[in-house]
């Protein structure tokens, strides 16, 4: 019995197989295209990796109390220097083995947020944010931007990322640090505070001396240590006294306005009273971003329009309020880390063993690493640096070939039927 080609099982199977093959070829034709400023983001990630390695070595060389591993959870700030071991080991709370994660009973803190910012790729994310905020790369500008920065010891990783991004983009940061921190941050005030880390990096020529914090405060409630116990405040003051740095503190002043005034005074004195191009906040310091839930739930680049809308009915005084409303300076808010990173950087948990840092490597990323940046689905490194697209010169021919095969069989079958109908053969009916 007569059957046109399009009704034959063999023809249908061959067409289906051909189309599936074309689909597979198209799917596997993906190419990696470098995202804008690829080189800068790679450079920033490598700077951060280098700084992490320096601090890791420094941490391992710091003597530790024999019982401190067990006692650390009771009090991270008290050290018996008469009873020490020669080397420190890495805490189970520090799965990346950075030496920058510390714990003290009674302090709040989200370990995932702190660990996630210790990924060197976080510096590449900060480069993206700064460029989004209007900071141009050195090759595209006529003057060096000035950036006001507020650091917190809660996020040593984010602090390193900001410094690495500033170095990459050749930006001059004016930094003020709140030395108190939350759990899983840089809260070993006696031996390895953020100021100690900062000094080590500058002494090691990782960052220029101009990147040193221009002033420091205790932080916490009203930026003056409210809510901290006396031993912790004593440890913080001791850590500050080891360094030649302006200390924003007055025992007679407990009002927030005083500490905000002093911060703004420092920022502008250190910049010859010139305006800033950007304000970058790290952490949840009250003097920096106030107590507004809207700001605390708004990570990333905050445009002037966005800040104007937030502060329209909100006069919560803080550095961010003054920069945006009085100086017309936009901001980057590095807070609520899980919301900030979205899918660009993996969230690292205490129990997660998938993400690792190869401390033996000379660089975190090589410029010519290309598709290897997708080496781990969990790492998701490629998302920040590369964009995967289907190869136009493969996909279109495959599509046209599939259409051509189907149309050819259809047209051929049409003429088969037409010839059969005009032949007047009974078997054709």
Predicted regions and their residues:
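Short, compositionally biased "basic patch" segments
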Residues: 20, 24-120, 124, 416-419
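C-terminal functional extensions of proteins
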Residues: 278, 285-429
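A substrate-binding/cap region within the structured catalytic cores of diverse enzymes
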Residues: 190-279
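Structural motif
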Residues: 148-150, 278-282
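Solvent-exposed loop/turn segments at secondary-structure junctions
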Residues: 153-157, 180-184, 223, 285-288, ...
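Membrane-embedded segments
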Residues: 121-124, 130-192
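Short, Lys/Arg-rich N-terminal segment immediately upstream of the first membrane anchor
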Residues: 1-8, 386-388
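Hydrophobic membrane-insertion alpha-helices, especially the h-region
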Residues: 10-27, 401-406
